[in-house]
Amino acid sequence: MPEVYQLYGMSASLYMGKVRSYLRKQHIPFVERVGGDPYFAEKIVPAVGRMIMPVLETSNGTLIQDGADIIDFFEQQAAANNESMRLPAYPSTGVARAVAYLFELFGGEGMLRPAMHYRWNFDETNLSFLKNDFMASLFPSGDVETAEKVFDFASKRMRAAAVAFGVTLESIPLIEQSYAEFLDLFSTHLKSAPYLLGGRPTIGDYGLIAPLFAHLARDPYPSLQMREYAPEVFRYVERMNAPEQVLTDGFSAGENLFSDDAMPATLKN
């Protein structure tokens, strides 16, 4: 019987989206638990040393924190057993691997500003959803008054973090322009391939899905924006959260990646 892992986090977490997508695509059994779970506060946080998510717990009590480390845990475990993951995250060829790493970095760092901007600067549309969502994850069984205080504290921290990351009145026009350009370019690419590098997701896709799912396709304001102006990207987000192969948009079955000498022009723009 396969091991069932415990994954602690929250749906709104950018890096939780990266890990969840990977586990689903690999058909790795797991139970998703919220950061407000008493066990997380009593056992996980002291062991890790701080309040941070996601954290994966194995059946023997081993804890792995950080999305990249969790993915590497499974990839390295398979390699040590002379096995291969169902859908290896790291391409075997040089150019494809370099492109995958580049987009992993872009997803985790380059997309951070639009993710934070479109979450925290549109309260009229987002705030009610965010408050309910954060409270459900961080304080699921407490009284409403205390839960709202928890949200207010978390919200203030995240808004300050957004500014620290470079989301300011001066930078917002450029952030919005660059994000719109990304949606346009990625939409064009997704008309010819279901994933970044071809027929299956790689570490580049897991980097992209982190901001695209948790913030930009899930929070009300940017979700509507994506559905209206970049439906191909929205369907990509849905594919990345499905454990099975999804043959929408005229794609045929197959999990091959582009060869190094046949990278599409849409990856070079």
Identify what each model region corresponds to.
Residues 1-145, 196, 216, 269:
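GST-like domain detector, emphasizing the conserved glutathione-binding G-site
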Residues 113-269:
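GST-like fold's C-terminal all-alpha helical module
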